[in-house]
Amino acid sequence: FMQKVLIYMNKLIDFYFDFISPYSYLAHKKILNINERKNFNYKAILLGGLHNLGNITAPAFNERKMKNMREDCNLIAKKNDVSFKWNEKFPINSLYLMRGYLFIDANKKDKFFDTCFDAYWKENVDISKEENIKEILSNCKIDQKSFITGIKNEKIKNELKNLTNLAFEKNIFGAPTFIVNNKLFWGQDRLEYALDEFKS
């Protein structure tokens, strides 16, 4: 029995995300609402890079899918009482912020994560613009000079590339994706299934 408890305590749900994914934002808000953040290991990937690897056309580049996605996200947000506003600057290049998430200190990651997501999917901010990135850094008390140097560091560049490649190798094709016990759950509507597996 004791061994099972220890295994349960050490196990986390891997959550693959990109700040440009509205469904990742909605999934994260659900996680906060049910106070489960401690059980998730957030893994940054570059969604555009993942789509290129898998030769996938994102919904953002298909007019009908895009229209459906906007309506779908609004429905999910309303149903779950989540503050959400479709960003007029969708999609953007999230490369610098995704690298930034990997670069910053562990104790600043949660604040940075929440601030980026809220800026883009709640406050309609274009988080690819330099002045808006600077404001995010200021709100998170992150040094701008070290951040700008950090995101150009080869180690950080390669880390994001490797995480994205690894996600592709694990058959991940979109965000959010949850992996627990080597089982893959794709989409914010599969969050409950991932949690069930985690607690089984």
Predicted regions and their residues:
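Structural alpha/beta surface segment adjacent to cysteine/selenocysteine redox centers
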Residues: 23-123
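Short, charged low-complexity linear motifs
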Residues: 4, 97-101, 167
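Short, Lys/Arg-enriched N-terminal segments with co-localized hydrophobic residues
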Residues: 1-8
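C-terminal cap of thioredoxin/glutaredoxin-like
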Residues: 10-14, 18-41, 111, 115-200
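A broad, structure-centric signal for solvent-exposed, well-ordered loop/edge residues
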Residues: 1, 20, 49-52, 93, ...
